[in-house]
């Protein structure tokens, strides 16, 4: 159709963990030209006797593994607009600002590489 795609990196990570696929391979399978925005968020881990289930809840900081996957996404798709989603259990403003600064730093790294 030619329309752009919003890539939810946290959802890719959560789904990969829950369903047993490689999130990096998933990113590599997406054509470079289609991703126009990236979303990041935190997730909740629900533990059970027989394992765990990650839930894309948007109520926690971005996990380190998601930051790593985000860096891979920015390398692949370029420094495109990024939104950090945090819907419930909002922290202090300083925490939100820190998350935004971390995303900005990764975008700036990519800008510097392109220059």
Where are the predicted features?
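Active-site glycine- and acidic-residue-rich loops that bind
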Residues: 11-24, 64, 92-94
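Gly/Pro-rich active-site loop or hairpin
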Residues: 20-77
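Conserved, mostly hydrophobic/aromatic
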Residues: 8, 38, 82
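Conserved active-site loop/cleft motifs that coordinate metal ions or position small ligands
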Residues: 81-87
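Active-site acidic/histidine proton-transfer and metal-coordination neighborhood
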Residues: 1-4
């Amino acid at each position: 159709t030619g329309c752009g795609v919003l890539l939810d990196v946290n959802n890719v990570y959560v789904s990969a963990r829950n369903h047993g696929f490689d999130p990096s391979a998933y990113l590599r399978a997406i054509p470079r030209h289609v991703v126009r925005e990236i979303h990041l968020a935190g997730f909740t881990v629900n533990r059970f006797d027989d394992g765990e289930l990650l839930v894309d809840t948007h109520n926690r900081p971005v996990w380190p593994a998601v930051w790593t996957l985000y860096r891979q996404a920015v390398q692949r798709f370029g420094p495109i607009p990024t939104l950090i989603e945090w819907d419930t259990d909002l922290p202090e403003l300083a925490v939100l600002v820190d998350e935004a600064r971390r995303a900005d730093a990764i975008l700036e790294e990519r800008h510097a590489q392109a220059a």
